[in-house]
Amino acid sequence: MKRNGESHLNGEAKKSRTEQNQEQQDYQDEYYSSSDEELLPSSQTSPVFDIAHSNSDKWQSTIRKVVNSVVSIQFSHVAAFDTETALVSEATGFVVDAERGLILTNRHVVGPGPFTGYVVFDNHESVDVKPIYRDPVHDFGFLQFDTKDVKYLKLTQLDLDPSLAKIGTEIRVVGNDNGEKLSILAGIISRIDRNAPDYGALTYNDFNTEYIQAAASATGGSSGSPVVNEDGKCVALQAGGSTEASTDFFLPVSRPKRALQCIQKGLPITRGDIQVEWQLKPFDECARLGFTAEAEAEARKMFPDKIGMLVAELVLPEGPADGLIKEGDTLISIQGEYISTFVRVDEILDENVGKELEFVFQRSGREIKQMIKIGNLHAITPDRFVHVAGASFNNLSYQVARCYCLPVRGLYVCDGSGSFEFSNQDTLGFIVETVDDKPVANLDEFVEVMKQLPDCSRVPVVYRHVSDMHAEYVQTIYIDRHWYTSFKLAVRNDTTGLWDFTTLQKEALPPAALVPQNAKYVDIPFSDPSRAECSKLVRSFVQVRTLCPSGVDSHPFKKDIGYGVVVDSTNGYVLVSRRYVPHYMCDIFVVFAESIDVAGEVVFLHPHLNYAIIKYDPKLVLADVQSPKFSETPLKRGDDLFFIGYNYNLRVVTDDVKVSSISSLNVTANSIAPRYRGTNLECILLDSKLTHECNTGVLVDNDGTLRAFWLSYLGESNELSFKMGLDVTDVLSILKSLQANHIPKSLRMLDAEFASLTVLQGRTRGVPQTWIKRFEDEAQDLIKFLSVDRVSAPTFEAKPSPLKVGDIVLSVNGKLVKNMRDFASMYDETSLTFNIIRQKQEMTLEVPTIDTTSMETSHVVSWSGALLQKPHYGVRQLMTKIPSEVYIVDKSSCGPAHQYGIVPISFITHVNDQETKDLDSFIQVVKLIPDKTYVKLRLVSFDNIPAAISLKTDYHYFPTTTLKRDAVSGKWNTEKINE
């Protein structure tokens, strides 16, 4: 995998904090191609030969033998763990034991965490593989397959011979280069004593080994390729390369060969270490560090082919060598044996785990002897993690500790999500020290603390980032155990290749009982006594915090903070923009006077006017919360108003403003990921720059009467939002219902969008002069017509709308339609009588309205890493026909859905050729499908392009789960179908 010297494993340019300005020179070969290409048909993937050095018959014969042992690895790291993120990718491996079905590849392919995958042989047979070993430090690991599953290919294996790797040796790299089925790259070994390449911080790095260097120009996907000589012997393992040259780095196969022999003999693969990183430094540099001339002469005499010695680069605190070896010490011997190579150090340490050995080294010209106990490298390599409250944790690993010279201890956040999302930018690199003021030095202590925390509780957490251990951070987090119900321990099982899950707590402790709390508002100071009532309007504002656990309805934000307006303080109702409350599947917190917060509940979502109503318990708030007075007169262009709002810094600001225009418009759609947007709006625009810095506010008269809500409207991109006013008269009927403590359960609406036309445009398209005169006579502001801009795709139960794009609306139920507000009668009527102009002909239509009761998302299915739901209204608005009600809204970065090519914003129409019109029929089909079997899916893209793919289920890591919202209680109920 290309790492470009960066700290993030998925190829994104995300550098560690200490290396922001440092350009790295090395990369680790991508084990996936740079694009999400699928494997090409065999007719398009013939071997790519690089014959710059040789084209002998012997090479041709060797390559024919080698390719039968080389496999393409298609795999997934199904969970973030240690230095690795969850991802789907591809790489190369090769058979080293045909009888046992053993495949050698890179450690960064096998990964330290959960792995699933399969391999494809040269004849396109594919078999499942399981990981059986990954080295704690060096970049190699082994996968295993059942040889009985290979039916049409005679298995061959490559022999490992590290002794044949010599300078000048002509080699071939045979592998899955850049995602191709098979590429063969030529090169010549130029170095055999290179230090291990540095791939950056917070990612996997090899160390304490020599690397072999050659110029082969390998790219993504070639990780794990065998490097063979002319006789077909594997002399090295492809691992990485340079981003600025054609240089590649190969791992010597001496340690993989030893590990393979242990596996074949059924012996444990012992690994010893003293937590010291050594670097091979040339003799002149050793001399500058204090290596004496006499010692150099002796070393050159004993090792005439060597150019340097091993020097201590890093000694980890609290490790076996801490205080005994110091940085800059030059290693001379171990247990009486003189040392010149990393290989011999590995051999000695691996054979003496738990024993004390004598180390002799020079420090500033003095020879020093120390007895050091050899530690067990496997003991400081984590093999378990805990998943709770949406985040994952493991004990700090040797890999991470070495990057920043830390003791190998502590609780490491390997997936900072859910309740433990400390930063929007970084999800890796955090060490948690205390939770709820209790120390959590390791996983066991952390588990016991988390068991005692009730759901929905708020607790302080103390943490640091490994890149800056000087800085201590304290943050109050919200413990979410109702959306993120899983609290489990995962332990690696090298026999089965799986990670075994153990539930640590079936249900969280119930939330603590809430008690009423006091809060005090500070009124806005005004020198003008006529605005005394305006100063109290701060008591009508509340902060609204939203947590959305999933990507339902393609809403882009998991966490958001905005403000709302209390429209009924007696019953506890707040009006807020749907920019912050997009759907029912979220947690809401209402904060009063920046002092106390109480839980809120979404009780009403307006289908097109971009506002939501949330409810809180007013008995829990002992503060002077007030509802404003509401005007019953619509605003006009030119009206003078007073603005009170909250800016980007969440601070209240005020301004005198004037209504510059009132426009009929629709918010621009996002066709890549359709989501909720405001439509058929009659929006108020102002002549003030200050108001555009505020996402929430109110427009009032001098006496404090509220004339309009100032709201944020999410635009076509995540970064773009529009700020516009919504006239209070447009929501007055809903507000009056709330004041009667009645929540509207159902509105009706027209299933179409309308846009404004000038009189000239209307005249050109056939509007008669008599109608134009009627509009001119009744106009109070701009004279315009409304035309049908878009007609939404109907649901399966509904009939298509009789309206067509381009229809010019003259009247509805006999009333002229001068602006969007004239459609308001649709909320209570099952049908409306339209007078329209279509193709210059005047027509009368009966247009039915649609019921919005079931419009919002209330049923979600998680299947094979894909998130499925009924197409929400934002999807139907942009389509003319819905292929199916099984809509793929999102997918995980590591599940079967991603691995086998399911694309979000598409539809599943058939499963195993059985039609799946809706989620219920889909569940009925998939619940009968066994685990680890292939499923045929028929898909239709958002652009109505059909496709067929196959997908292999994996219920161990990706069980089928449904979430349904109870219409009465508003609670979401979870049910697991396949697990």
Curated annotation (Swiss-Prot):
Keyword tRNA-binding (UniProt): no
Region of interest (Serine protease), residue spans: 65-260
Biased amino acid composition, Low complexity: 21-34
Pfam families from the UniProt entry: PDZ_1 (PF12812), Trypsin_2 (PF13365)
GO BP terms, alphabetized: apoptotic process; cellular response to heat; lipid metabolic process; stress-induced homeostatically regulated protein degradation pathway
Recorded GO MF terms: serine-type endopeptidase activity
EC number: 3.4.21.-
Recorded superkingdom: Eukaryota
Subcellular location: Nucleus
Location of the region described as Disordered in the Swiss-Prot/TrEMBL record: 1-43
Transmembrane regions listed in the UniProt entry: none
Record: active site: H108 (charge relay system), D139 (charge relay system), S222 (charge relay system)
Residue stretches making up the PDZ domain: 277-362, 871-943
Keywords: Apoptosis, Hydrolase, Nucleus, Protease, Repeat, Serine protease
Gene Ontology CC annotation, any one: nucleus
Homology family: Belongs to the peptidase S1C family.
Record-given protein name: Pro-apoptotic serine protease NMA111
Organism: Lodderomyces elongisporus (strain ATCC 11503 / CBS 2605 / JCM 1781 / NBRC 1676 / NRRL YB-4239) (Yeast)
Name of the gene this protein is made from: NMA111
